[in-house]
Amino acid sequence: MKTLRARFKKTEGQDWGKSDQRLLQAVENNDVARVASLIAHKGLVPTKLDPEGKSAFHLAAMRGAAGCLEVMLAQGADVMSTDGAGYNALHLAAKYGHPECLKQLLEASCVVDIEDSSGWTALHHAAAGGCLSCSKLLCSFKAHMNPRDRSGATPLIIAAQMCHTDLCRLLLQQGAATNDQDLQGRTALMLACEGGSPETVEVLLQGGAQLSITDALGQDATHYGALTGDKLILQLLHESARRSSPPSASLEEDSGEASSQNSVSSHEKQGAPKKRKAPQPPASTPVPDDRDAYEEIVRLRQERGRLLQKIRGLEQHKERRRKEPLEAEASSVHSLERQVQELQQMLAEKQEEKESLGREVESLQSRLSLLENERENTSYDVATLQDEEGEMPDFPGADALMPKNQSPSAEEIVASLQEQVAQLTRQNQELLEKVQILEEFEKDEAQMAEESQAEVVPLVLYESLRAELEQLRRQYTEAMHSQQQQQEGEPPRAQEGEETAYQEIKDKGITIQNGPSVPDLNGTTYAETKANGMELQAGGSKGVWNTEAGVSEAAPIEPEAAGSEATGKDRLAAKEMDTSATMAEALNVKALGDNAESEPVAAEDTGGKENPGMKADEVDVLAQAGLTGTVIRNMEAIGVRDTGIQATGLEAKAVKTTGVQATVAEVIGVKVTGVQTTAIEAIGVKDTTQVATGAQADCWQATEADCTGAQDTAMEPTGAQATVTETTEAETSGTEDPCAAILHPGAAAAALQAELETRIRGLEEALRRREREAAAELEAARGRFAEAEEAARGRSRELEALRELLATATATGERARTEAAELRQALAASEARVAELSSTVDAAREELERMRGASVPADEHEHALSALRDHVTRLQAQLADLARRHEKTSAEVFQITDLSKEVFTLKEALKVQQSTPASSKEEEALRGQVTALQQQIQEEAREHGAVVALYRTHLLYAIQGQMDEDVQCILSQILQMQRLQAQGR
């Protein structure tokens, strides 16, 4: 079954509206004008409870909003209303320490001793909160000093338990009972000893607290002090026990029992509407003789020493409290700053390490690619030069040709080749730089999560190389097709000339063998051949194959075969002049074609297409000059080899995508990009120096040219060089006649065709292997890049963790600074407390000095004590007389009351009689009776005034001392009779 309060709360909670919420909000904001407006215009009730059990009126008392509380009281708010917890506004104001609100409520006729749901009064709340001003205000409004809550605790017990020394002193001065006990038998002194407050213990001992009182367990205050372990408290208790004497102890016990009985009786009667008795003065211990006075002086000196010691201890404690927070704060701040610096340093080191690792990875990648390219270039160049310069000729007569091979022109050719190798190395370096730029671009793109773009550059390069390879193959096919058409154009002539030349060589074989030696013939023709070679070089013959050398070789064959050396020389000179003029024109045309092309690929196309035409022009020129069919067939064979070697060089160039491909093409002697080397010219010079007058010398020279061309062509490490060498040796050894290769160009072309197909297959295989290697390198590079990216992400995560740690350290530093500020505030509060304690000590010193000055001699004290005893005896006699006179006065008062009633009835009767005629005798009798009664009333009034004056005198005496309960009852009756008399009048 619900209680009435619960129902009331539920009803009010249901009626709670927005206006009530606005009023509550205005009180929270302490908006006095808003509160007044809402109450006046809306008609709101300030004491209405919300669903949580609080109202605007109670909130104003709790928050200390004195202005809002004044407005609500002016609007007629119920002062005695309680909130959901059972507190009224007076309890809340005392609990939260708002003396202004407390004064307003007390002036508004709020009951000062009303209890809350736990039995606490406003003084209990003020004692628990330690509010000295609120306690003084309640004492000034005659609050009961010894009310008990449900646990039997009084305000003094609560103040002692909370160690509020000043509040205990105030309550003792206002007459609070020192030795009252709660339901557990504990006194204020026991709780002060338990709380460890020597100041509170000292105040209670000075107020008359007894050490012999025990609690429900039989433990006294000394036991509580021993449990605390405070030496100062134990010293105070021992001194108080030693100082107390039996007479004084009995007197204190009597006074304590009387005060306890009075407090209990007053607590039992506090519900009755009776007047409050006068407050009891604090008990004091009288000094019976000089010995007690001497002991008092000694005690005061000891107390002074204790106070000085306490002052020094407080000063030391203050200094220690002042230094400890500063040192702790400084150490914590230094440690936090050091941590922040370490974290920042670690962060900088991690960033530097990340940057250095990134740079190292990039440098290693670039260096690796550079070293690989340089290794390939160097190994290829060294192998090429070793194959070109280190191999010795294997054919007969090589020893005779060696001194002539080491000519100044050959050294110049080697120097030019070295310069070209250096130029190609520089170009290779530039290409490597471009590749490095492309790799950096790919790395930047990969960081933007576009990994697909990393394959763009290699795929484009691969497609371009494939297209270039297909184009070169088409050029090679066209060149072969044009050559076949050229060969098919003169089959009878070639065949006929072949048979004629072969027959002539067969007929004149003995003459050739018996003729001059090979060195002599070489010496005869070397000067002319060298001259022709120098003219070809001066004429800008870069990019042209050694057709001129073949012409100069084939030209002296017919004159020498005829046996007339002089005639042969003349004819040779004439034919060389014609051939030189014709070839000069062809070379000029070729040079103009090479200069007109700016791009390397275009130059390659031009060189590939013009070469067969040039071969045809050369054949026509030689035919017009009167050359034989044998010379033409030799040129055609040379042209076939030229075309095959050129196509092979183009294929090799298509395979090589780096700077090595240029080196291969230049070493073989095929320059279709506009940069023509003189390697083939060197071969032509070698061929020219090896010309013989007989068919055997021509065959050996052709064989040497074939071997040299095959050696220069097969520069790839795929075994093509060995294949060409074996093919040449097979042709040389398998031919019974040394001139068979010259006389059968169709078979040589077929052999070259097969050789070229073999080389093409080898180059395609090398291309596929190169593609696989490039793909593997690309995958490895991607793996390295992925590892570097993962490492970068790991470092990024570490960096983020370090940043978070730095933020945490910064926040910790901020909290430490905040705590330091709070510690400073606490230090300031402690300093203020110390200052307050210092002022208290000064006041104690002044009081001590005043007590010293107020001490009187023992005789004067004895005389004053006897005078006081006589005065007490007289007062007791006067009180007994007053009681007797009071009884008499009470009877007289009742008589006066009866007489007053009779006078009143007589007056009424007179009024009635005045309206009706009566006899004169009756009228006179009545008048005489009235006069007598008036005189009697005057006499009684004089006596009553004397009684009242005596009562006032005794009341003044009672204010200064103790008034008994019976005297108080008599005085109450007298006052009641006075009120009745006033009403009767």
UniProtKB/Swiss-Prot annotation:
Residues 291-488 form a coiled coil. InterPro entries: Ankyrin_rpt (IPR002110), Ankyrin_rpt-contain_sf (IPR036770), RAI14/UACA (IPR042420). It comes from Mus musculus (Mouse). This is Ankyrin repeat domain-containing protein 24. Keywords: ANK repeat, Cell membrane, Cell projection, Coiled coil, Membrane, Repeat. ANK repeats lie at residues 52-81, 85-114, 118-147, 151-180, 184-213. GO terms for cellular component: plasma membrane; stereocilium. It holds the Pfam family Ank. The gene is Ankrd24. Residues 311-326, 349-360 have a biased composition (Basic and acidic residues). GO terms for biological process: auditory receptor cell stereocilium organization; sensory perception of sound. The keyword Nucleus does not apply. Disruption phenotype: Deficient mice exhibit progressive hearing loss. Loss of Ankrd24 induces morphological changes in hair bundles, early postnatal hair bundles are warped. Stereocilia of deficient mice show diminished recovery of auditory function after noise damage and increased susceptibility to overstimulation of the hair bund. Homodimer. Interacts (via C-terminal domain) with TRIOBP (via C-terminal domain) isoform 4; recruits TRIOBP isoform 4 to stereocilia rootlets.
